Every structure is written in C-alpha cells, then in structure tokens.
UniProtKB/Swiss-Prot annotation:
GO terms for cellular component: cytoplasm; ribonucleoprotein complex; ribosome. This is Small ribosomal subunit protein bS6. GO terms for molecular function: small ribosomal subunit rRNA binding; structural constituent of ribosome. Belongs to the bacterial ribosomal protein bS6 family. Keywords: Ribonucleoprotein, Ribosomal protein, RNA-binding, rRNA-binding. GO terms for biological process: translation. The keyword Ribosomal protein applies. Binds together with bS18 to 16S ribosomal RNA. PROSITE patterns: RIBOSOMAL_S6. The keyword Ribosomal protein applies.
Amino acid sequence: MRNYEVMYIIKPEVEEEKVTALMEKFKSVVEEKGAEVTKLDKWGKRRLAYEINKIKEGIYVLMQFKAEPAASAELDRVMKINDDIVRHMIIREGE
C-alpha cells in the first residue's frame, strides 16, 4: 500500500452539514477500496490564491490515506463529477 495525500476545495456557499457529509463521503470512497485514512483535517474557509470560475474563497480539506492505486483513481473520479468541489489534487507521498 502507498501513502496518498489529497487536498480539495469545496465551494464557500455549501452549508456546514453538507461539508461534513462530503468529507465522510470521500472518506468512505477510499475505505470501500480497502484504504486506511490516517488523517482528515478541515482547514476551514480561506481565500484562494487566484480566482477560479468567479470563486474567490473556498473550504479547504486535507486527507491522508494508505491505499492501493485503485482507491486513489476512484476518489479522483468521484471528485471530478461532484459539482461542490472547486479543485482537488491527489499526490503520492514519497517512501
């Protein structure tokens, strides 16, 4: 299993309950593929470095997990089709 880190930005107008639901949804997506989530940290609302689709701030969330490559591919697919996600990036951490 490899170590992965994903940072994603949720639209600022999303309600707090839905933010929590999205965090749990993405956590369960990787856990269903046999991954172990080692860290899930909500950074809160922050200003973006540059405007994305007329959005100037977003809710940042950081998640670290240990998984096989299939889990990160599935998470990437799910995040791409979710309209509440402004941006996301999944990186494989060095050994």
